[in-house]
Regions:
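Alpha-helical transmembrane bundles and membrane-interface segments of multipass inner-membrane proteins
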Residues: 1-160
Length: 160
């Protein structure tokens, strides 16, 4: 039970942080449009994204909501039923779930996602905290899978 409560609390914390930052962006950043954060490196720029990453699938809100919900249910299943005792995998899935739900809340309530981080040193999409959580979580998840494969190969070669 502690396993479930801890992971639920972690997911809720990520969602809360995401929603608080987005609330700040709407109230403070939207009226001014943009402001420097780290000069010549990062600016805070208010953008409403009607699609997913890079505005892909803009105008397909129902599809995005259904597809995202299905993916998040699969991630939640993996977190709560398949990752006991695997802390790195749990961390990865908590990040993906928290970030995914944060953006899903925006999409369901507003039809678009609030983005606000703009990298000035490279041409890239404006993104948000939830996007960072999802990307770091997926990268960590890939690392976990890779490490599991390496461990399985080592175990198999030692048994031969």
């Amino acid at each position: 039970m502690a396993f479930v409560l801890f992971n639920l609390a972690a997911v809720a914390a990520l969602i809360g942080i995401d929603q608080l930052i987005k609330l700040w962006a709407v109230q403070v950043l939207q009226p001014v449009g943009a402001m420097p954060f780290i000069p010549h490196v990062v600016e805070l720029r208010f953008v409403l994204n009607p699609g997913m990453a890079f505005s892909l699938l803009s105008g397909r809100q129902l599809f995005l909501i259904i597809a995202t919900s299905a993916a998040l249910l699969a991630v939640a299943y993996g977190l709560f039923f398949r990752s006991r005792g695997k802390r790195l995998q749990q961390a990865a899935l908590v990040l993906v779930l928290g970030g995914g739900i944060g953006n899903l809340i925006d999409r369901v309530l507003n039809g678009e996602v609030v983005d606000y981080i703009n990298l000035l040193f490279m041409r890239f999409a404006v993104f948000n905290f939830a996007d960072i959580c999802v990307c770091v979580g997926v990268a960590l998840w890939v690392l976990v899978i890779f490490l599991d494969e390496v461990h399985a190969d080592d175990t198999a070669s030692k048994e031969q």
